[in-house]
């Protein structure tokens, strides 16, 4: 055990402390606190640890809002012990640091609240794993932090009341996964996938249907429970409105919706460019692409392509006036951003759910002559260290 004085927040949910000249990344602690920490991993010049006792607490510390999270619990809500307002400030500090170090861009601010749900009960989609061995075998649960071990109590504070009711008492095939979604009306849909047998994973609807209906604006989507949809109940509406305003499209223009999922952004882009324009939505997920084609079937000027973004960009002959990107946590990366720059796309809206990846992508754009016009950070995952960053960039 180590007695540590905790310093500034780091990306990934830890704060930085020092012990005998070595950097220690401490989870479940806040800046300024003095804690007793248990070392969980040693990596030469730095260690990872978790606070197990608070000797001097920050005024921002509260009793955890999540009953199952913490050093000896689930890894679900790793900031549930901080006031929501202080957590938003902390997340803003982390994003600012990553942008300066990795993106060469100066920004100051804090994460903004999304919608009016508050810090708890905001999640609409959950994936649970089923334990394969021991006393927990056959029971569904959340993973402990960076562990294959599961916490089979399902009272995570992110989850609305009743969303997981009854699932903890049931027995499931070991190694399976449960996908749970709430639709627009609040009805629950549960789909079991796996376990894998002879390289194939079975899919079974346990409750409700295979697709959950979601609504953004005047349009409805039927999205597979196993496919991607924004986790926060108000996120899709928030980002959609922002993209529409920042795109500054006019009738007849062309827009690319890259990593487009079910086509939520394609819908608002299509409204702006009208029948004389063109929108291309690209995603590798067949389920998401099917949902996009169904939801946008009345918009003849929208094409939905099931393909990698890299390959799709290599085949386009018509330059986009605006490109919207919402890549996975790893970011868009150099190859995709090089292709966008080579295509001469004058305006780009980039969305990222991991601060370091987002900052690196911003740096890549800047290397091609793009400048950040505006940047906002959203607290789209309350009680956790995760954020959603959105930037609009234009060729200088």
Question: For the regions a protein language model found, what residue spans apply to each?
Answer:
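Short loop segments at secondary-structure junctions
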Residues: 133, 395-396
């Amino acid at each position: 055990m180590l007695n540590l004085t905790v310093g500034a927040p780091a990306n990934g949910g830890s704060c930085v402390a020092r012990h005998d000249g070595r950097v220690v990344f401490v989870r479940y602690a806040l800046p300024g606190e003095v804690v007793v920490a248990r070392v969980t991993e040693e990596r030469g010049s730095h260690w990872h640890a978790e606070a197990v006792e608070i000797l001097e607490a920050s005024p921002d510390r509260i009793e955890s809002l999540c009953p199952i999270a913490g050093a000896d619990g689930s890894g679900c809500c790793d900031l549930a012990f901080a006031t929501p307002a202080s957590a938003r400030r902390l997340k803003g500090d982390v994003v600012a640091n990553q942008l300066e170090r990795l993106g060469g861009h100066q920004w100051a601010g804090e994460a903004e609240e999304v919608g009016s749900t508050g810090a708890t009960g905001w999640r609409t989609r959950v994936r649970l794993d089923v334990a394969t061995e021991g006393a927990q075998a056959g029971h569904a649960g959340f993973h402990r932090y960076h562990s294959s071990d599961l916490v089979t109590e399902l009272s995570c504070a992110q989850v609305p009341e009743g969303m997981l009711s009854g699932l903890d008492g049931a027995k499931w095939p070991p190694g399976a996964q449960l996908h749970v979604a709430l639709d627009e009306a609040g009805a629950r849909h549960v789909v079991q996938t796996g376990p894998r047998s002879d390289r194939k994973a079975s899919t079974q609807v346990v409750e409700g249907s295979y697709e959950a209906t979601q609504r953004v604006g005047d349009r409805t989507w039927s999205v597979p429970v196993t496919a991607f949809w924004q986790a926060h109940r108000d996120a899709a509406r928030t980002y959609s409105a922002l993209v529409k305003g920042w795109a500054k499209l006019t009738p007849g223009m062309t827009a690319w919706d890259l990593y487009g999922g079910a086509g939520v952004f394609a819908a608002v882009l299509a409204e702006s460019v009208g029948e004389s324009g063109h929108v291309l939505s690209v995603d590798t997920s067949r389920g998401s692409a099917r949902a996009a084609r169904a939801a946008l079937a009345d918009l003849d000027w929208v094409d939905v392509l099931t393909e990698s973004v890299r390959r799709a960009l290599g085949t386009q002959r018509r330059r986009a006036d605006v490109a919207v990107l919402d890549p996975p946590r790893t970011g868009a990366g150099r190859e995709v951003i090089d292709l966008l720059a080579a295509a001469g796309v004058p305006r780009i809206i980039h969305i990222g759910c991991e601060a370091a990846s987002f900052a690196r992508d911003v740096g890549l754009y800047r290397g091609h002559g793009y400048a950040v016009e505006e940047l906002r950070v959203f607290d789209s995952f309350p009680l956790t260290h995760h954020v959603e960053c959105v930037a609009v960039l234009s060729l200088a």
